[in-house]
């Protein structure tokens, strides 16, 4: 694909997991969105949800692979489904091209351990986990998307792990609150230590609009295409409550755990997005609690 793809304004999809829950998916354990891959009765629902984001204006969709990482499957005692679930995520996303051949598929590579926390395991373990998931998604995708990573170390290891696939990548960093990653590092620390060969751009992922505003100047200073996947959660820092829920494998709708901001209507979120676009952001998308209606409003920001 064109490495300059994000040099102009592009629209990404929104929050697949919460949208699936709204549409009737019943989560199993802590699998959340992966429940729609595990149960064949939900495969059409998953495809239709991808398609609705595209109809709303998304030029890029992300595979539903956030909860198909190995640790999440181990928690739910279905690690034997690792290959099946990741391939199915790629296959269903790829099927959207039958209807919209120009849509791009991003292979979502989430943190390979806990969400919103830096991975303190060995480099080799992290690298192997990224590689094994990337290998399964690779045949179905146009580029890789590192989704909601919490440390520069994980980002660097993740990039190393995909090099043999010769595909470009988008980096999605997470900041729960303030101006530092959960690892304590600053955004500006990233670019100095990163091999940017194949880098499409950098986003802040699963962040509130206000949090992105706080970090706008620093991410802009990196000198690469930048943007966001905004969430509409009430809580900006879900730890440690999310930790406890994951460890107990408690079945809970993340909407109930983290809350929903009623003020972030599609119109209000589009106002934030316009402000960020006017400041130079070209990668515009949503994360948790952003629906096709939000993405439709974002399309008005296209160049």
Could you tell me what each predicted segment is?
Residues 1-303:
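Domain-level signal for soluble alpha/beta catalytic cores
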